[in-house]
UniProtKB/Swiss-Prot annotation:
UniProt entry keywords in alphabetical sequence: Flavoprotein, FMN, NAD, Oxidoreductase
Catalytic function, reaction form: 2 a quinone + NADH + H(+) = 2 a 1,4-benzosemiquinone + NAD(+); N,N-dimethyl-1,4-phenylenediamine + anthranilate + 2 NAD(+) = 2-(4-dimethylaminophenyl)diazenylbenzoate + 2 NADH + 2 H(+)
EC class name: oxidoreductase
UniProt EC number: 1.6.5.-, 1.7.1.17
Function: Quinone reductase that provides resistance to thiol-specific stress caused by electrophilic quinones. Also exhibits azoreductase activity. Catalyzes the reductive cleavage of the azo bond in aromatic azo compounds to the corresponding amines.
Keyword Kinase: no
Protein name, entry field: FMN-dependent NADH:quinone oxidoreductase
Cofactor binding summary note: Binds 1 FMN per subunit.
Domain of life (superkingdom): Bacteria
Entry binding sites for FMN: S9, S15, N16, S17
C-alpha cells in the first residue's frame, strides 16, 4: 500500500502528534514491508497561505495561466496528486487554541479544489472525489475534550474530509498533553494502544481489530 503522512506540528521531533505517526509507521514497516510511505511536513516545508494571486491562479484555466500562475498552481496540483495516489492517508494534527494549526488549514485550502477534489451535481449537491482512501487522523490535545463541545476541530475535520470524499476516517487522540508529565504519558500510551488495535487491511477499511 501507498501511505501518505501529513505532519503539521511546529515542534518537530518533540511533537506528540508526530510521535503517534512514528508509532503507526513503525507498525506499518513490520506489517507492510513492501509498502511505500511519503511524508510531507507542513511546518518544516509550509505551503503558502491563500491570497489573491493563489485564488486567481487556481481559478484560471490551465491553458490560460501565465508563468507565475503556473508556478502557484503547480504546488496545489502536487498536493492533490499525492492524495489521489495514496491508498492510506495519515493526518497528524495538534490542537492549537481549540482548532487545527494554520499551516494545516492552508493545506486544506490548497486541496479543496472545485472540479478536482469535489464537484457539484446537477442538483447542486456536493460530491467528494477523493474516494476509496483509508484515513487516520492522529490528534494531540493539551486538555481532555474529546466528545465535548470544546472539541471543535474533530467535527470540522469530519465534515471537511467527507466533503472531499474521504468517509473511511478514524480519529485517535492523545489527550492531556499539557496536564503534566504523568497525564501526557498516559494519554500517549492510550493512543498508541488504539493504534495497535487497528485493522489496517485496505480491503476492510480502518476498524478496531
Amino acid at each position: 500500500m501507498k501511505t501518505l503522512v501529513i505532519l503539521s506540528s511546529i515542534l518537530g521531533d518533540r511533537s506528540n502528534s508526530k510521535q503517534l505517526a512514528d508509532h503507526l509507521l513503525a507498525r506499518l514497516k513490520q506489517s507492510e514491508p513492501g509498502g511505500t510511505v511519503k511524508i510531507r511536513d507542513l511546518a518544516a516545508d509550509p505551503v503558502p497561505y491563500f491570497d489573491g494571486a493563489t485564488v486567481g491562479a487556481l481559478f484560471t484555466p490551465a491553458e490560460a495561466r501565465n508563468a507565475q500562475q503556473q508556478r502557484i498552481a503547480a504546488l496545489s496540483d502536487d498536493l492533490v496528486a499525492e492524495l489521489f495516489d495514496a491508498d492510506r492517508i495519515v493526518f497528524a494534527v495538534p490542537v492549537y487554541n481549540f482548532n487545527l494549526p494554520a499551516q494545516f488549514k492552508s493545506y486544506i485550502d490548497h486541496i479543496a479544489r472545485a472540479g478536482v477534489t469535489f464537484r457539484y451535481t446537477a442538483e447542486g449537491k456536493p460530491e467528494g472525489l477523493v474516494q476509496g482512501k483509508q484515513v487516520l487522523v492522529l490528534i494531540a490535545r493539551g486538555g481532555k475534550s474529546e466528545g465535548t463541545p470544546d472539541d471543535t476541530m474533530t467535527p470540522y475535520l469530519k465534515q471537511m474530509l467527507a466533503f472531499l470524499g474521504m468517509t473511511d476516517v478514524t480519529f485517535i487522540a492523545a489527550e492531556g498533553m499539557a496536564m503534566g508529565e504523568l497525564a501526557a504519558q498516559e494519554g500517549l500510551a492510550l493512543a498508541r494502544q488504539r493504534i495497535d488495535a487497528l485493522s489496517l487491511d485496505a480491503r476492510q477499511g480502518l476498524a478496531a481489530a
